[in-house]
Amino acid sequence: MTTIVSVRRNGQVVIGGDGQVSLGNTVMKGNARKVHRLYNGKVLAGFAGGTADAFTLLERFEAKLQAHQGNLERAAVALAKDWRTDRALRRLEALLAVADEHKSFIITGNGDVVQPEHDLIAIGSGGNFAQSAAIALLENTELDAKSIVEKSLKIAGDICVFTNGNHTIEVLDYSAK
């Protein structure tokens, strides 16, 4: 799997993820890009799970964003409905973390769209480790969102064998608005 972390703080939302692709117990690739900017850079998305499945879902999500003029919540719900009802999509095993300047969501294959507590998302095999680290950093430091994501991914990578140190991090800065 992988680790994807999203933190929102002080006018920024950040999503970061590692680059490891595993096949069983073998590392197949170490520099996969699992975090992307969508909808003219206004939406961030990261995925965990089967890489081919996740790319399929990411493409579908991007199409939903276009269809709903960038409305993140409506696009997330539309994708979740399709994911739940489409026989082919139902077999896909992945999770998506998506965020814009207003909201963040986790989209699951069960058709769930979850708005997380504390504007923090951590998914994938190292998600619990990254979430614990991010909560501690949010509650006990004044670090910015990007630094918290970086440190959380590092900690998760030190513990989880399916998470590496090759990170992709995207920042959406809306503090000037």
Swiss-Prot record:
It is found in: Cytoplasm. CDD domains: protease_HslV. Belongs to the peptidase T1B family. HslV subfamily. HAMAP family: HslV. It is an enzyme of class 3 (hydrolase). A double ring-shaped homohexamer of HslV is capped on each side by a ring-shaped HslU homohexamer. The assembly of the HslU/HslV complex is dependent on binding of ATP. InterPro entries: ATP-dep_Prtase_HsIV_su, Ntn_hydrolases_N, Proteasome_sua/b, Proteasome_suB-type. It catalyses: ATP-dependent cleavage of peptide bonds with broad specificity. This is ATP-dependent protease subunit HslV. It comes from Aeromonas hydrophila subsp. hydrophila (strain ATCC 7966 / DSM 30187 / BCRC 13018 / CCUG 14551 / JCM 1027 / KCTC 2358 / NCIMB 9240 / NCTC 8049). The active site is at T2. Na(+) binds at G157, C160, T163.
